[in-house]
Amino acid sequence: MFLAQEIIRKKRDGHALSDEEIRFFINGIRDNTISEGQIAALAMTIFFHDMTMPERVSLTMAMRDSGTVLDWKSLNLNGPIVDKHSTGGVGDVTSLMLGPMVAACGGYVPMISGRGLGHTGGTLDKLEAIPGFDIFPDDNRFREIIQDVGVAIIGQTSSLAPADKRFYATRDITATVDSIPLITGSILAKKLAEGLDALVMDVKVGSGAFMPTYELSEALAEAIVGVANGAGVRTTALLTDMNQVLASSAGNAVEVREAVQFLTGEYRNPRLFDVTMALCVEMLISGNLAKDDAEARAKLQAVLDNGKAAEVFGRMVAAQKGPSDFVENYDKYLPTAMLSKAVYADTEGFISAMDTRALGMAVVSMGGGRRQASDTIDYSVGFTDMARLGDSIDGQRPLAVIHAKDEASWQEAAKAVKAAIILDDKAPASTPSVYRRITE
């Protein structure tokens, strides 16, 4: 038996906590025997004193074990259980292609996703732009879809990592969100509750990233890889670029449209293709579905070319109560904004920089995201035909096409786009889509 205040005192004085002490505290968070004040105190001591790798692993596994941990053994699946997690960005629609692509190659992807947070778009919000799409199937239905289709994308239920939900709510109001061991534990508690064989992390870098600097993004990626592997799940991470909108669109319905066009081959943004393929390659190799990069890429290209990935996406949509002919007739089902027109720069030049965070917030301001949890989303608004870094901008090439609910909203968004995109008289050096791969 432990005392919460003695655990807090031990960490306050700079000592490492044991696995038993951490589990006692996390179980107390779950069953409400630990007060909010005690949670806040421990969070602040961790913020200032950090955690050792064994402490980080214990924290993550204790939060994972505070609720249901999915077990797929009874289904006798003939492939690995694999998933991807992104730290979030703007125009980051990779999940919608990646899940079906990996499933078409023989993996099983039980993806538990989130809603938009701040300037970043949420996968669940995007999918809810599809009429009827059910993001909360019951547990049995979720398992059936994974078994039959190979991929399902759903929301987090209250039974998964409940201690994390309470811990995070306290961190959010006590200035302890940006602690790498606490971020790592929060991300991985939910992901490891999926019962995975392998995981790939997409950690964003740049003006639209969650972490403010390259060094902090790198530190987070290394922490997640270390903790997840320590918890027994094969994990790699990619540091990917978020100095510009990843896709050619940003919003909800507009990104779903681009995802379908990507899968069918109608249109593939080159940077989106690079990042999606790189993440899929990691999943295939970690899941033992391919022996190396070349074999993985060949398999992934094949399921794009032969239509199998698009077919899997269509089957997932139908299985989750969306239209059965969605892939073939997506424009019939996706909402369209009242006003769609291009915005042009006031001067000419090359795009040298982009405030990606500001562009994400512009989508939120138009109604495409939430300022608070109770807000309703306008799924139709957003940007398409986004210009990219290095593009030559003149009176012919717009910065973007803005899809808005009315003229006033369009004008506000146009102002935000112009302010967020910087022009120069010479083109900038090109930046990679993927900066680094982290394996340990």
UniProtKB/Swiss-Prot annotation:
Is this entry keyworded Transferase? yes
Q: What top-level branch of life does the organism fall under?
A: Bacteria
- Any one cellular component term from GO for this entry? cytosol
InterPro entries associated with the record: Glycosyl_Trfase_fam3, Glycosyl_Trfase_fam3_N_dom, Glycosyl_Trfase_fam3_N_dom_sf, Nuc_phospho_transferase, PYNP-like_C_sf, PYNP_C, Pyrmidine_PPas_bac/euk, Pyrmidine_PPase_CS
- Pathway(s) this gene product operates in, as recorded in its UniProt entry: Pyrimidine metabolism; dTMP biosynthesis via salvage pathway; dTMP from thymine: step 1/2
Q: Which residues cross the membrane?
A: none
- The entry's keywords: Glycosyltransferase, Transferase
A GO molecular-function annotation: 1,4-alpha-oligoglucan phosphorylase activity
| Listed GO biological process terms | pyrimidine nucleobase metabolic process; thymidine metabolic process
Keyword Transferase among record annotations = yes
Q: What is its EC number?
A: 2.4.2.4
From the UniProt record, list the reaction(s) this protein catalyses.
thymidine + phosphate = 2-deoxy-alpha-D-ribose 1-phosphate + thymine
Fill in the subunit field for this protein.
Homodimer.
The role this protein plays is:
The enzymes which catalyze the reversible phosphorolysis of pyrimidine nucleosides are involved in the degradation of these compounds and in their utilization as carbon and energy sources, or in the rescue of pyrimidine bases for nucleotide synthesis.
Which family does this protein fall into? Answer: Belongs to the thymidine/pyrimidine-nucleoside phosphorylase family.
Q: What is this protein called?
A: Thymidine phosphorylase
